[in-house]
A protein has these predicted regions:
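N-terminal Sec-pathway targeting helices
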Residues: 1-11
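Hydrophobic membrane-insertion alpha-helices, especially the h-region
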Residues: 11-19
Length: 225
């Protein structure tokens, strides 16, 4: 079942520098030609109309642009059409602020804006955070994400891809959406049990940011001096 037709009351769960949360009418942006724009796939879990657990693939919209000041990285979250829970915002913020220094990127004048483009739904959880953060890095470096690939996991303070739950459901959701490769944490959630790889699909455990970024882009994480 497509997740778009689930009841709007359903809360979607996925698994400063400051966090700013505003309605879209409040922000003043540069001209569209100065804004980098990317829509990325993320894996999550929810329940269907029979209240059974299910995996799903949804989208996050990222805008990135450079300001004229040097007042520090700003990470902002749209409140429309969908929203991010406080935990999701904190997880994304933490992942971005860990990934950008690992890539040796100057960020003092950047603004990152994120949108969950599903009216009436709220994004919960942390498992989208590594995918969002490494996508921001790729945008900043001008390196496209490879088609048919996605990542689920967090970013730890040691620079590793952290464990998340619901892997089997997420892998199956990606398979049904015709993804060729899914990157998962090499350290598993012990309560999650084993997962199986669908036919003709690659599931690749990754430990470090470097491994995950190379898998998503085919490029090295760290920007050259």
């Amino acid at each position: 079942m497509s997740w778009q037709i689930i009841s709007k009351a359903l809360m979607v769960g996925l698994g400063v520098v400051g966090i700013v949360c505003w309605g879209p009418e409040i922000w003043a942006k540069p001209s569209p030609s100065q804004i980098l724009h990317l829509q990325i796939p993320i894996l999550g879990t929810s329940v269907n109309t029979q209240h059974l657990p299910m995996g799903l693939v949804s989208q996050i919209v990222i805008d990135l642009y450079e300001r004229r000041d040097q007042d520090g990285l700003q990470i902002q979250f749209h409140t429309e059409p969908g929203k991010f829970s406080l935990f999701a915002r904190q997880s994304i913020h933490q992942a971005i602020t860990r990934a950008l220094p690992a890539a040796n990127l100057p960020v003092a004048s950047w603004t990152v804006q994120l949108k969950f483009p599903y009216a009436g739904l709220t994004m919960y959880g942390e498992s989208l955070s590594a995918m969002v953060a490494l996508s921001v890095v790729a945008m900043a470096k001008g390196e496209p994400l490879l088609e048919g690939r996605t990542l689920t996991g967090t970013i730890t303070d040691q620079g590793h891809i952290g464990a998340v739950g619901g892997l089997q459901l997420k892998i199956l959701a990606a398979y049904h959406q015709h993804f060729q490769r899914v990157f998962v944490p090499s350290v598993y959630d012990e309560t999650d049990g084993d997962w199986r790889t669908p036919f003709l699909m690659h599931v690749s455990p990754v430990r470090t940011l470097e491994e995950a970024y190379r898998g998503l882009t085919g490029q090295q994480l760290s920007a050259r001096p």
